[in-house]
Amino acid sequence: MSLSPSDRELVTEELGREPTPAEEALFENLWSEHCAYRSSQPLLSAFESEGDRVVVGPGDDAAVVALPDPETGENSDTYITMGIESHNHPSYVDPFDGAATGVGGIVRDTMSMGAYPIALADSLYFGDFDREHSKYLFEGVVEGISHYGNCIGVPTVTGSVAFHDDYEGNPLVNVACVGLTDDERLVTAEAQTPGNKLVLFGNATGRDGLGGASFASEDLDEDAETEDRPAVQVGDPYAEKRLIEANEELVDDSLVRAARDLGAAGLGGASSELVAKGGLGAHIELDRVHQREPNMNALEILLAESQERMCYEVRPEDVDAVAAVADKYDLGCSVIGDVTDGNYVCTFDGETVVDCDAEYLADGAPMNDLDHVEPTQPDRDRPSPDLETAFEAVVAAPNTASKEWVYRQYDHEVGTRTALKPGDDAALMAVREAGVGLAFSSGADPNWTDTAPYDGARAVALENATNIAAKGALPLAAVDCLNGGNPEKPDVYGGFRGIVNGLADMCSTLDVPVVGGNVSLYNDSPSGPIPPTPTLAMTGTKPGYDAPPAALSGDGDLLVVGDGGDLELGGSELLAQFGGSDQFPALPDSPAAFIEAVADIADLDSTHATHDVSHGGLAVALAELVGDAGADVDLAGSPDALSVLFSEAVGRVVVETTDPEAVKERLDGVAPVEHIGHATDSGRLELSVGDETLSYSAADIASLRSVIGETLE
C-alpha cells in the first residue's frame, strides 16, 4: 500500500514541496483507514459519548469513567478506564503473536491514562468450526491471549466466541481492557508544555510490525500468511509486566505529564499524535532511539511497531528520575527530543527527514464519502425439524456450546478481584476502593447482524445490558469495536452503517454513553467480506460483590421475564443449523425500564438464579441453567414449539425465585412475566412443549455442550 495520488497531492500542497520518503510513509500510515477512520468517522457522530460519569471520552488512548459512590450515588474519586482494540489481520497471518500483541496493545492504552489494568475481555470470531484452518486459528489465538494475559497478571474474565462461514478468510480478534485509577493519577495523551522532554520508554526498537497500520487498512489476499508476516509484531509479555509496574511507579511519583503507547505507526504515530492533541510540535532526534537491530534507517525507526514501548512527556528536571525507574525495571529509556511550539520535526544522521504540521499529520486526512445500499431483511422460509433433533443440534452447536475450553486456559482470578467468573452472563469484579461491584460483558452475534444489521446491533447492545442487569448491576458505559468488510462496496458499507446506527440508537435509549472504541474495516478476503460485527464491551455497577448465578439452586419457581414479541427465528442458531430464513425478532418497547427492573429483581434475596435468553434461545438458556439442580418446565400453552424454544429475541431473562409475586410486582407495567415451571433437585431438564416432551440429565446436556473441548483435546 502507498500514499494515493490524491493524498500525495494534498500533502505536497501542504508542505510546499515533495514529501521526503519518511514523510510519505508517515502520511501513508497515519492517513490510513486504520488510523484516520476515513470511512467511518462521518458515521460516529451518531454515538452519544457524554454523561455525568464520563471524565474522558473518545479520542484518547482509553476512556475514563467515574464510579458511583454506593452510598450517595454521586461520582466517587475512583475511576475506571475502558478501551477496546482489534488485531484482526495480524491474527490471521500469525494467530499466536497477532492475538498476544493485541492484548499488549490494549493494556498499554490503559496504562497511558495512569491506570492499572484489572480485567480483560476477548471477543473472537472464526470460520466454520468444522474446518481445520478455523481450528488452527482458534487454538493459536486462544494460546496467544492466554500466554500474554497470564504472564502479565491481568485476568481475562469475560468474552465471547462465534463461528460463521464468512470469517474463514478473515478472523476477528477484539480485546477490551478495564483499568483502575483515580482523580489524582489521571494522565492523558495531550502534550502540555513546550520545553518538556519526549522520552521513549520500554523495549528496544526493531523492525517488526513495519507498516502495520497500512497493512490493517487493506483486504487480505491469498498469500497473506506468508507475504504479510513482517507486518505482524512480536510481543514479550515479561517486558510488558515490567513496563506495567514501572508505569505505575512513574504515575505514583507524578513524573509523567502526558503519555501515549506505541501502537499503530509506531513512534511516528505516538509522538505526532501526542503533540498534535496539545496543539504543539516536537523536535525528535531519531538517532537517540535505543535499537535492538543494527543499521536501522529513519523510516524503520519511525514506523516499526515493536511492542512494549511508551512515549512520555517529562519535565526536564524529572528525566533522571524516569531513567532511574527504567533502570530499576531493566527497561530502555531514551530522551529522544523536545515538545515545541512549532512543527513536528524529526532528524536522522544530521539531516531533517520530517518537517510538517503535527495536527495536519495526525488529523488532516480527508474523509471518504461512500455510496451505500440499505440492507433488507429476508423473507420467511422456516425449516421444520422435529423438536428433539432441533434441541440437540442447537445445544451442541459450537456457537452455543460450552466455552470452558477457552476460559480455563486464562488465569481469570489473578488480582483477587474476580467475584463472578467466566461462564456466567457477565463477570463481576470487586472494586474495593469504591465499594462497588463492576460487571463486565462483551460480545456480538454475527448471525444477528448478518440477518439485520440495524436491529441485530440494537440486540447486541440490549443483550450486553441484560447480561449486566441479570447480575444486579446497572449499565455504566460502553466501548465498541466496529468490524466490517471493504467499505468501498456499497452493500458492505450499507451493512456497516446499519450496525453503527443500531448500536448508537439502543445505547442512547438505555442511557449508556459510548465513551470510546475502535473501527476495523477492509476485513475482506478472496472468500468475501465478514458479516458486519459490532463488538460491544459494557460495564455496570452495583453495591457489593454478590450476584445470583446462572445455575439453578433447585428451590424456586421458574419465570421468564420480558417480551419476546412474535418470537421470529431470524438470526437464530436454529436457522444456522437447519437452513431457512426469517425476519429478525422485534425488540421490547421500553428496554431501559426493563433493564432497571431486572437489576432490582436480581438483587432480591428471593432470587436464586438469573440467566438471559439470547444465543440459542430459551432452549439453550434452560440447558445452561441445569447442573446439580434441574428444572421441570411446561410450555404446553405454546402453539409453536420451535419459536418458543429457539427464537433469540433478546430482552428476556429466566429467573429462579421463591417469591414470584415480588417479581411480577416489580415488572408490572414494564414487561410480561410467564411462569414456566419449577427448579428441582433431580439434576434433569424435563421439558414439555405442546404435546411433546423432552428429558435430559445434566450429564446428557454436558455431553452435548462439550463439542469444543472434546474436539480440541
UniProtKB/Swiss-Prot annotation:
Binding site for Mg(2+) 1: E85, N518
Biological process annotations from GO: 'de novo' IMP biosynthetic process
The family this protein is said to belong to: Belongs to the FGAMS family.
Residues that coordinate or bind Mg(2+) 2: D109, D261
Catalyses which reaction(s): N(2)-formyl-N(1)-(5-phospho-beta-D-ribosyl)glycinamide + L-glutamine + ATP + H2O = 2-formamido-N(1)-(5-O-phospho-beta-D-ribosyl)acetamidine + L-glutamate + ADP + phosphate + H(+)
Source taxonomy: Archaea, Methanobacteriati, Methanobacteriota, Stenosarchaea group, Halobacteria
Organism expressing this protein natively: Natronomonas pharaonis (strain ATCC 35678 / DSM 2160 / CIP 103997 / JCM 8858 / NBRC 14720 / NCIMB 2260 / Gabara) (Halobacterium pharaonis)
Oligomeric form and interacting partners: Monomer. Part of the FGAM synthase complex composed of 1 PurL, 1 PurQ and 2 PurS subunits.
Pathway given in the UniProt record: Purine metabolism; IMP biosynthesis via de novo pathway; 5-amino-1-(5-phospho-D-ribosyl)imidazole from N(2)-formyl-N(1)-(5-phospho-D-ribosyl)glycinamide: step 1/2
Alphabetic keyword roster: ATP-binding, Cytoplasm, Ligase, Magnesium, Metal-binding, Nucleotide-binding, Purine biosynthesis
Record's protein name: Phosphoribosylformylglycinamidine synthase subunit PurL
Gene Ontology, cellular component aspect: cytoplasm
Pfam entry (one): AIRS_C
Residues annotated to bind ATP: Y37, D480, G517
Residues that, per the record, bind substrate: S86, H87, N88, H89, R108, Q233, E305, S306, Q307, S520
EC number: 6.3.5.3
Bias type Basic and acidic residues, positions: 1-17
Protein origin, superkingdom: Archaea
Active site: H34, H87 (proton acceptor)
